[in-house]
Amino acid sequence: NAGDPDREGQLLVDEVLYFVGNTKPVQRILLNALDEKSVKSALGDLRDNQDFHNLYQSALARERADWLIGMNLSRAYTLSERYKGNKVALPIGRVKTPTLALVVRRERELADFKPVDYFTVKILYTHENGTFWATWQPKDEQKGLDSDGRLINKGVAESLVQQLASSPDGVVKSVTKSKKKDLQRLPLSLSSLQVLAGKAYSYDPQTVLDTAQKLYEKKLTTYPRSDCEYLPPNQYGDRMAILSNLAQSGDEKLSQWAQNADRNIKSRAWNEKKITAHHAIIPTTVACNVNSLTQAERNIYFLISQAYIAQFYGEHVYEQTRIVVGQCEEEFVANGRVVIEEGWKSLYKRQKSKTNADGDEPDLTDERGAESGPKKDAIEEADHLPSVKKNDSVQYTDSSVESKQTKPPSRFTPSTLLQAMKEIHKFVKNEELKKQLKAVSGIGTEATRANIIDELISRGFMKTSGKKQVLSP
């Protein structure tokens, strides 16, 4: 049995063996990669196929559950609608129905959304070594706050500013400095590639999959339908050939990055224990001239190669400073962040969306999920703060009362909906279900999520609009 080393790979081959009535002994080979070293290693570690019978049963249960749910509930809901006079076929599926529900729920949240006006108070303090802005942190019992801790009474802000101006002396209550590191972003799985390409080029997930498949068929990149972001250590030796090829790829940025890469760095990506059925999508050792590719192929090859090269750049290192000022029995906080070593993030600076009309620059290093943002504003970070010590005196110099308004949750795009499918546990309140859904990496698979979104659109259950292809029911 040489099927993929996951439950679906086990099922596909075992079903054939059962169908033909095989009675001979069967051995199982577990292949995570198809390079010579990996294949030889797997051939030297063959297992009894019966050891994986539970994996087969797991996939069989999934297959039959999908069939029973689809066959029975699709008929039930379709007939129910026809009794109401609606001549419509309603396909119900274990994956497609909750996927559509995400879009419908977001639409209802938008319909029910009522913006809230609120205010932030910022104070400019002067210290002997320089000036800095600090943001007021109201106490929980402060009058004029809503249930989310936002100041909704402008009069409170204006009164505070007057009080501070009349008594301008402040003192530094604490100074906290910490050196922090951001590890190299991992190489790409299919879903992370689809999300990244959606941000960078507004490509829909199916376009990304189709393009990655073409690159795979040209032997320029590895297997595209992977859910893994790690690499087998026995492929670490291929880095020399891959980086040398990228240095001569014809793409100016890739060439420069590959030439400057530190080939002695071994990032966290090289981890045998984290490999699933397939390893992360990376460039192969086959040389590529990007000028021979279509624009879509070139863009997807660029993202895959960029993430691979990032493994050979250092960690992003920065110093974070937090200053707390006390004045008139209130606290004001200033945050500063100074980059010490740009590291791998130098590859992701000023990545501008090709189709973004409003000029926004998507953060291609952001690997957070698809949930809407925090309710409260984060304190802005300054590039530099003056050198201050605890108990130093500071003087109130100026103030700013900023009027803001809460923003509605963003509509899904095909790429963010795909990410939400993978992280469906974030949208579930039941703690037990949340754990189970997180353990199985959400609903759908790397190979099916894009197709499910496309099917919902083609059947008219969802529609896209605008350059960003936002989704609505």
What does each model-identified segment do?
Residues 2-425, 431-461, 466-470:
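Toprim catalytic domain recognition across nucleic-acid enzymes
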